[in-house]
């Protein structure tokens, strides 16, 4: 039996028994599976809610436990903690990829290891716990699973994500607005590719491609940093 058919193992792993098991099934259903089966709910709406719940819990924790840090410092730390890479690492620790329902095509192209799919599933899982058990239980789940990430971030042991790093480089010269613009997207809903450019006014700094908007923006920022480093070498 595939693990997504029996979620008792996952419930034991996260030490949470769901009252409404349907919420957990939806949280672990990728859009590609829903497209194949029709009339099946998938996890994008839960992902939307889970992102906000995660932001709230981490923000509250940092606010209450790091009273010596300024708003700006806390915002930077939160950006390090609540990012796609962190969510991916949580998903890997929970072996979440084994439980996700997805299309055969998605699975054959590496969907169970894809960063964006796993990160989104963690956010959806957080939302499902929140809806089923409330804020206290989901807070405990988040702080338990993100504890090491929070500790490393506060000890400056996590490398900045590319968007944050680019922002810090650019804003050394003042409060300059950086814009991420989605140029286009292509492909079926379960395998959509996003193209993003990062600009300052009319100056394009870099382009990025990814299987989520977040991933394409991070790759655009990474390319912008690389381009800036190359230009420095030839100045």
From Swiss-Prot:
The active site is at residues 51, 123. Its EC number is 3.1.26.3. InterPro entries: dsRBD_dom (IPR014720), RNase_III (IPR011907), RNase_III_dom (IPR000999), RNase_III_sf (IPR036389). Keywords: Cytoplasm, Endonuclease, Hydrolase, Magnesium, Metal-binding, mRNA processing, Nuclease, RNA-binding, rRNA processing, rRNA-binding, tRNA processing. It catalyses: Endonucleolytic cleavage to 5'-phosphomonoester. The keyword Amino-acid biosynthesis does not apply. Mg(2+) binds at residues 47, 120, 123. It is found in: Cytoplasm. Residues 161-230 form the DRBM domain. GO terms for molecular function: double-stranded RNA binding; metal ion binding; ribonuclease III activity; rRNA binding. GO terms for cellular component: cytoplasm. Residues 7-134 form the RNase III domain. The keyword tRNA processing applies. Transmembrane segments: none annotated. Digests double-stranded RNA. Involved in the processing of primary rRNA transcript to yield the immediate precursors to the large and small rRNAs (23S and 16S). Processes some mRNAs, and tRNAs when they are encoded in the rRNA operon. Processes pre-crRNA and tracrRNA of type II CRISPR loci if present in the organism. Belongs to the ribonuclease III family. Homodimer. HAMAP family: RNase_III. This is Ribonuclease 3. The gene is rnc.
């Amino acid at each position: 039996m595939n693990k997504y058919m029996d979620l008792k193992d996952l419930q034991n792993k996260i030490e949470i028994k769901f009252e409404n098991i349907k919420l957990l099934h939806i949280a672990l259903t990728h859009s590609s599976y829903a497209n194949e089966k029709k009339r099946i709910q998938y996890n994008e709406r839960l992902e939307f809610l889970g992102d906000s719940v995660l932001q709230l819990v981490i923000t509250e924790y940092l606010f209450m436990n790091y009273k010596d840090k300024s708003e700006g410092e806390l915002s930077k730390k939160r950006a390090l903690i609540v990012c796609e890479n962190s969510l991916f690492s949580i998903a890997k620790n929970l072996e979440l990829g084994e439980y996700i329902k997805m299309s055969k095509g998605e699975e054959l192209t590496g969907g169970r290891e894809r960063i964006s799919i796993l990160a989104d599933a963690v956010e959806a899982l957080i939302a499902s716990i929140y809806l089923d058990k409330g804020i206290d239980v989901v807070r405990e789940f988040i702080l338990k699973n993100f504890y090491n990430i929070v500790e490393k971030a506060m000890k400056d042991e996590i490398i900045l994500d590319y968007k944050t790093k680019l922002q810090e480089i650019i804003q050394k010269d003042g409060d300059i607005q950086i814009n991420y613009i989605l140029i286009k997207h292509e492909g079926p809903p379960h395998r959509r590719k996003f193209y993003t450019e990062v600009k300052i006014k009319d100056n394009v700094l870099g382009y990025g491609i990814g299987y989520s908007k977040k991933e394409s923006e991070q790759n655009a920022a990474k390319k912008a940093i690389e381009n800036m480093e190359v230009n420095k070498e030839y100045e």
